């Protein structure tokens, strides 16, 4: 067989594999549609068939004012690796409106220790495999994938256009960008794009030894951007795939990555739904369970010109005025005191009947009962006195006589 025949046979084989892959994709998409129909509105009804009942309970508990607003939000996740895949999974389960995924790597068996992918997805692009799984988990979420490296010139322009015009409404920017990449060059690309369009974003990462991680909330002009305080040591012009071929490999723990992803999504939800306090910087050290928090101020000599521009804009903005809290005199919560509860100062002198227990209220409410009734002080005293008196009435001689007669 000639070389041409071998190539033609290889082409036929690859075409058959491609058709089989397309068929499998269509089957999985049909299976995802059969899993459940799309839900138009989130409901707080507590039934087994409602996937949002536990999320909507946050409203009932006054944690979130309107949880369903999450369907109006668009989040971009850059990097679908150890942290990014878990982040995308959590956001999908939370019911985010639209999820945009960026990555150019493929799923490998070496990823199985930390990603939510399955071994049968090895060889697929990470964004494609993630989209399949996430669509099956929650078909209500709109998922958009981009399989390219954002650090190249052409792809950076595409990335810039996507994050600035692919919001929930066409032509609007995304609501939040989550950086889950593992290299300096990609972080700087995200930083430059967000500074240029003044977009808030979270940076995240896990250390090379897999025992520490962090998240950082970056608001251009208000907090330090990634270029304001870059790492002390940076490896430049090195492709990660080259390091893999040379046997260089960083450690990874699914626990550390899961914790970091949890912190990332938790703060993203607080930012998107306006509840709680969003951490500007939150670290995690697994060796001693240390969680440092801090706020990093922008560098007035930052190398990023857009960062300097955002700093000037922020300085000219009027400072938010803190609302004065009006002190209102507290009124009694209950008009009646059914249980006879009284507050006594610690230094109050003891009264004569301080040791006398209060009478037990038998009627404590419908559906409740007392397990037992404690004896009163007077009853205990009478019982002790009776026992003592009974012992004194019988003399020792009488007891001896009774024993001899037995």
From Swiss-Prot:
InterPro entries: D-isomer_DH_CS1, ThiF/MoeB/HesA, ThiF_NAD_FAD-bd, Ubiquitin-activating_enz. ATP binds at residues 82, 103, 126, 149, 183. Pfam families: ThiF. It comes from the Eukaryota. Keywords: ATP-binding, Metal-binding, Nucleotide-binding, Ubl conjugation pathway, Zinc. Zn(2+) binds at residues 225, 228, 302, 307. Signal peptide: none annotated. The keyword ATP-binding applies. Residues 378-393 have a biased composition (Low complexity). Residues 373-397 are annotated as: Disordered. GO terms for cellular component: cytosol. One of its GO terms (molecular function) is ATP binding. GO terms for biological process: protein ufmylation. The active site is at residue 249. Belongs to the ubiquitin-activating E1 family. UBA5 subfamily. E1-like enzyme which activates UFM1. This is Ubiquitin-like modifier-activating enzyme 5.
């Amino acid at each position: 067989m000639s070389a041409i025949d071998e190539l033609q046979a290889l082409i036929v084989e690859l075409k058959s594999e491609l058709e089989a892959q397309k068929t499998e994709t269509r089957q999985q998409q049909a299976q995802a549609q059969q899993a459940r129909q799309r839900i138009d509105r989130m409901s707080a009804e507590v039934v087994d068939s409602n996937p949002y009942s536990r999320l909507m309970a946050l409203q009932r508990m006054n944690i979130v004012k309107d949880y369903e607003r999450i369907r109006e939000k668009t989040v971009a996740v850059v990097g679908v690796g150890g942290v990014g895949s878990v982040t995308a999974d959590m956001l999908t389960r939370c019911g985010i409106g639209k999820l945009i995924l960026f990555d150019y790597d493929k799923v490998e068996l070496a990823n199985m220790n930390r990603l939510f992918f399955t071994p049968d997805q090895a060889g697929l692009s990470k964004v494609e495999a993630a989209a399949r799984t996430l669509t099956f988990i929650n078909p209500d979420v709109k998922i958009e994938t981009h399989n390219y490296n954002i650090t190249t010139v052409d792809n950076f322009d595409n990335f810039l256009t996507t994050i600035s015009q692919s919001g929930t409404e066409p032509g609007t920017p995304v609501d939040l960008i989550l950086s889950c990449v593992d290299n300096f060059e990609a972080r700087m690309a995200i930083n430059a794009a967000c500074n240029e369009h003044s977009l808030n974003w979270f940076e995240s990462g896990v250390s090379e030894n897999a025992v520490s991680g962090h998240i950082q909330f970056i608001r251009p002009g208000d907090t330090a951007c990634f270029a304001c305080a870059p790492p002390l040591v940076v490896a430049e012009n090195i492709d990660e795939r080259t390091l893999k071929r040379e046997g260089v490999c960083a450690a990874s723990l699914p626990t550390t990555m899961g914790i970091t992803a949890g912190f990332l999504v938790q703060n993203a939800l607080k930012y998107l739904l306006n509840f709680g306090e969003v951490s500007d910087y939150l670290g995690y050290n697994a060796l001693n369970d240390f969680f440092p928090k801090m706020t990093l101020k922008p560098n007035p000599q930052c190398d990023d010109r857009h960062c300097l521009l955002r700093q000037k804009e922020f300085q000219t903005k009027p400072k938010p005025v803190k609302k004065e809290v009006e002190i209102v005199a507290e009124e009694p919560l209950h008009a009646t005191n059914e249980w006879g509860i009284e507050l006594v100062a610690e230094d109050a002198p003891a009264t004569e009947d301080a040791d006398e227990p209060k009478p037990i209220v038998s009627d404590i409410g419908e559906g409740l009962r007392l397990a037992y009734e404690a004896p009163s002080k007077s009853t205990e005293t009478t019982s002790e006195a009776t026992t003592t008196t009974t012992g004194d009435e019988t003399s020792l001689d009488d007891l001896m006589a009774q024993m001899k007669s037995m």
